Amino acid sequence: MKKYISFIIAFALLICTVAVSVSSAEGNEYWPTNENVRIIGRYSVSGDAVNVGYGLTELNFNVKAESVTCTISTEQEAPAAPYFAVYVNGKLTKKFKVNKGEAEYTLASGLSSNKTTNIRLVKTNERWMIAKIGKITVAGGEIAAPSKAKGKLIEVIGDSISAAYGILATDTETEDDVTTDATYGYAKILADKMGADVNLVAESGKGIYCNYNGEAGKTMPAIYDKNPDGTAYSHTAEPDVIIVNLGTNDVYGMGVNKEITKDNITAAAKEFIAKLREVHQNSYIVWTYGLMNSDMTSVIEEAVSSFSEDGRISFIPLPAQSEFSDGVGKSSHPDITANKATADYLFEKLINNGIIGSGMPGYLETSVDAAWDYDSSKMLGDANNDYDIDICDLVRMNEHSENSDIKIDDGNADYNSDGKIDSDDIALLRKQLLKN
């Protein structure tokens, strides 16, 4: 399967944008402030630039223009170069590497200044592959009013599994920077299913008490209060659900450092849960763990159970990844199939455990869609007209077509041209959207 999607791209939240524009011969120039650009995920501001690192960190804005370019810089280079995916009106149009130094990158061209076009610039790989996003130049037009946020936010905290390490790899020789792509990971898929934005805080090798190499320090709890560049993070965004997926690297770390005990890890897990509750008093906290090993299951269960009086903290163990997929990504990490199955598994558990329900956009009932009017004049497949293509659009198209007499434009929703909108269209649409 991976051979067909090795160059695919596939989802958090603080809001930031471009309030000031400067006209030039090339077009109107904008800088990230706080008006017309939504920034989803963790970031820091340095002068006029926005520093981003974690996968799924996203700049989301609308333009009425002919083309859009953006100045991006980095001190990194292959095999640790930052990569970005660009979505135009919800459709993946390119994935590109940021070269060392500063350069101007074309995000979109051939647009119409008479129409609103949504642009999403999404970071795909690891935290330490940091880039600075600066000037946005809009030629033949201007930045328009932003699209509204999805209204729900999940935060996913984890290691390489959550960062989607090596998910696009076809062999062990492929470089990490291009094959690590969180847009295909379970965190993004789960957020789409929930109709939520996602704030991904995941880095390969990180553990609860110790990292993959046995180092007891610089773990995920130790860096949780920081932005990718090491500056302090404010925690002002309040997630509806926090999902912690840690413990896998502690197993490997214990194998390297024999002085580390499960008691050390249990204590660290309890401290981290207490920290999460301190900074996010209203979030539901879910610890999930499994896929690559299960040795820490009892440790996590003990840590979570110690907060039973909280009433909004739970543990969801995951099956081995072999139950989800026959294949693997790089270094035996979960592949795309396993990530999709993990998202489906967690989504079902979240519903069955009463953690999410009819109040979540991704959990739709007929009544929710009663007033929804399908507009085929909008972008391909954007059923809810939010300039984004996600599972909510697919569910809405499928449900509405089965329960009404409206005619669906086969150029907009009937992707396999069989005269009906069903799960086959959903599968094909998702596949086509992810293809590069």
Outline where the language-model segments fall:
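Sec-dependent N-terminal signal peptides of Gram-positive bacterial secreted proteins and lipoproteins
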Residues: Y4-S23
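Cellulosome-associated attachment modules in secreted, modular CAZymes
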Residues: A19-S24, P361-N436
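N-terminal secretory targeting modules
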Residues: V22-I157, S162-T179, G359-A371
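Alpha-helical cap/lid subdomain in secreted, periplasmic
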Residues: N89, A222-G357
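Structured segments of extracytoplasmic/periplasmic soluble domains
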Residues: S160, I189-D197, V201, F272-V279, ...
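Surface-exposed patches in mature extracellular/periplasmic domains of secreted proteins
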Residues: V198-E203, W287-T288, G357-Y363
